[in-house]
């Protein structure tokens, strides 16, 4: 009983003490400190959600009924707006507009200038400033000068009025033959044809050049690349192709000179006049070729866009007139080089080997427009300069992916005095198939390549041991290979003024028959020098007889 009273009194005293004293604070949990990455992620997520909540429209915008997909369309705005030049750094010009920025790729024209200076919008800087690339020299340009928004991309004249004429990147004639009188104009920035509009057909374009037609034939409506270093004959080969195709097929050609020598452009123009490809004065409408020049003395903006100008002229002949057009680009590497300069001027960080990060995109935008549609075709032959003869350089390597045939010009072959200096083993074509060419042509081409490859394999043995150590079969292989090597040479029409030898156009059937005869050993008794710089096999026989008479006398 006494113990129970003691316990109850202790409980009562404890309760009084608890009521009188303040509540003891609970022990705090250690503060949660998120990691820096988690903190930044949480802040970014909160900001994005709040920004999205503020920017979300109450109702969806009305449909416009046009499906541009954010690509190049005709919906350019702000035509007639006036801006002011606020900064000039070489070929880069910054222009301020008080209201409404012109879209990317819009053409602007500088007012009150001594020449027509076109600027193309490349970047938007802030809310009222654009950075542009000049299509001509910016000498004499001053801050505050007025600039007009044309409301469209660079637009150039197209159609038959351009035949026999030379125009620049913005469509101005530069041949001193007056204005180009036409009602047809097109923007140089256009979408590639849709898949449903494209057509694929396997047909050879006969060039009349033996080594090309036999070993790496060109596809009508395809893309062909001429690879080679400096001075191995790319431009001469292109000039011969223009000459042969104009005479043999009668089709229209467009030549785009991109960043090459002005002297060569002038020589090409004179050659075309002399050969009748271009006619002057009253007969100009009978011309077969249009020339578009943006040579190496032009600013990078002009060189980066002149290829598109030439392509636009060719597209009109294909789409509006249903023509099979030949588009020659000399040199597609200069197109890449100019875009690299523009990229550096715009402050983009360079990619591999100093090229622009958008190398594949720039090239693809041009190449995808060169195609065959159900209306007509564009067959493109592109000279491709190979820096330091390195085919793994990003510029030529990226171009390879777009090509249907490659014609590789070799310095080793040119050093032997064999022109055109086409490498018969490195040059390739998707057309080299028995289903396309037929069994005779295919077997002859492969037979020629096999003999040349065997000769190449034997050259080390010959250099070390000499010809006497070879077997009889190997000696025969070497003799035939040397004849084939020389027989692949050919005098060109456009080189007559330099060599004095008349040019030769060799039909495809004759080429196949002649080389098959060499492989079969029909001409083993003829000296190898009789195969050098001739056309068909009849000329070889005639030259051999002439050599025999000279040696006998």
UniProtKB/Swiss-Prot annotation:
Subunit organization: F-type ATPases have 2 components, CF(1) - the catalytic core - and CF(0) - the membrane proton channel. CF(1) has five subunits: alpha(3), beta(3), gamma(1), delta(1), epsilon(1). CF(0) has three main subunits: a, b and c.
Q: What is its EC number?
A: 7.1.2.2
Q: Name one GO cellular component term.
A: proton-transporting ATP synthase complex
Q: What is one GO biological process annotated to this record?
A: proton motive force-driven mitochondrial ATP synthesis
Family classification: Belongs to the ATPase alpha/beta chains family.
Q: Where is this region: Disordered?
A: 16-36, 52-71
Q: Where is the transit peptide?
A: 1-47
Q: Name the SMART domains for this protein.
A: AAA
Q: What is its main location?
A: mitochondrion
Give the protein's recorded name: ATP synthase subunit beta, mitochondrial
Coiled-coil-forming residues are none
Q: Which GO terms describe its molecular function?
A: ATP binding; ATP hydrolysis activity; proton-transporting ATP synthase activity, rotational mechanism
Q: Which InterPro entries match?
A: AAA+_ATPase, ATP-synt_VA_C, ATP_synt_F1_beta_sf, ATP_synth_F1_beta_su, ATP_synth_F1_bsu, ATPase_a/bsu_AS, ATPase_alpha/beta_chains, ATPase_F1/V1/A1_a/bsu_N
Q: What residue spans carry the Pro residues bias annotation?
A: 24-34
């Amino acid at each position: 009983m006494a113990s129970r009273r003691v316990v109850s009194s202790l409980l009562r005293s404890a309760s009084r003490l608890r009521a009188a004293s303040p509540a003891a604070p609970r022990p705090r949990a250690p503060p949660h400190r998120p990691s820096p990455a988690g903190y930044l992620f949480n802040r970014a997520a909160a900001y994005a959600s709040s920004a999205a909540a503020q920017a979300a429209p109450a109702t969806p915008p009305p449909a416009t009924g046009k499906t541009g997909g954010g690509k190049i369309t005709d919906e350019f705005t702000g035509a007639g707006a006036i801006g002011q030049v606020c900064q000039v750094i070489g070929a880069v010009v910054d222009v301020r507009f008080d209201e409404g920025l012109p879209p990317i790729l819009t053409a602007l024209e500088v007012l009150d200038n001594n020449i027509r200076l076109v600027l193309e919008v490349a970047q938007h800087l802030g809310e009222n400033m654009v950075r542009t690339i000049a299509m001509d020299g910016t000498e004499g340009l001053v801050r505050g000068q007025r600039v007009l928004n044309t409301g469209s991309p660079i637009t150039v004249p197209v159609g038959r009025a351009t035949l026999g004429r030379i125009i620049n990147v913005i469509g101005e004639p530069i041949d001193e033959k007056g204005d180009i009188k036409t009602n047809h104009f097109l923007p140089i920035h256009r979408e590639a044809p849709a898949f449903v509009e494209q057509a694929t057909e396997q047909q050879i374009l006969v060039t009349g050049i033996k080594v090309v037609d036999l070993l790496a034939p060109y596809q009508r409506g395809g893309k062909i690349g001429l690879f080679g270093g400096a001075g191995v004959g790319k431009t001469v080969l292109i000039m011969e192709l223009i000459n042969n195709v104009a005479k043999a097929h009668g089709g229209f050609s467009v030549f785009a000179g991109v960043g090459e020598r002005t002297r060569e452009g002038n020589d090409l123009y004179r050659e075309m006049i002399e050969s009748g490809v271009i006619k002057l004065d009253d007969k100009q409408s009978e011309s077969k070729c249009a020339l578009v020049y943006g040579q190496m003395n032009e600013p990078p903006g002009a060189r980066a866009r002149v290829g598109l100008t030439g392509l636009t002229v060719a597209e009109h002949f294909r789409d509006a007139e249903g023509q099979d057009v030949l588009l020659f680009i000399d040199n597609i590497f200069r197109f890449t080089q100019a875009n690299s300069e523009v990229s550096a001027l715009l402050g983009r960080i360079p990619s591999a080997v100093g090229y622009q990060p958008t190398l594949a995109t720039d090239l693809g935008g041009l190449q995808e427009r060169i195609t065959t549609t159900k209306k007509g075709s564009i067959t493109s032959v592109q000279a491709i300069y190979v820096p330091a003869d390195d085919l793994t350089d990003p510029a030529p390597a990226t171009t390879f992916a777009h090509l249907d045939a490659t014609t590789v010009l070799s310095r080793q072959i040119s050093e032997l005095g064999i022109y055109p200096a086409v490498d018969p083993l490195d040059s390739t074509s998707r057309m080299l198939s028995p289903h396309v060419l037929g069994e005779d042509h295919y077997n002859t081409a492969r037979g020629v390549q096999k003999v040349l490859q065997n000769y190449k394999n034997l050259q080390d043995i010959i250099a070390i041991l000499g010809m006497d150590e070879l077997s009889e079969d190997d000696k025969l292989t070497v003799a035939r290979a040397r004849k084939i090597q020389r027989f692949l040479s050919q005098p060109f029409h456009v080189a007559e003024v330099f060599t004095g030898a008349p040019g030769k156009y060799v039909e495809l059937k004759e080429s196949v028959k002649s080389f098959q005869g060499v492989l079969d050993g029909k001409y083993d008794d003829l000296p190898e020098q009789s195969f050098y710089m001739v056309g068909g096999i009849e000329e070889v026989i005639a030259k051999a007889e002439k050599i025999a008479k000279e040696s006998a006398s």
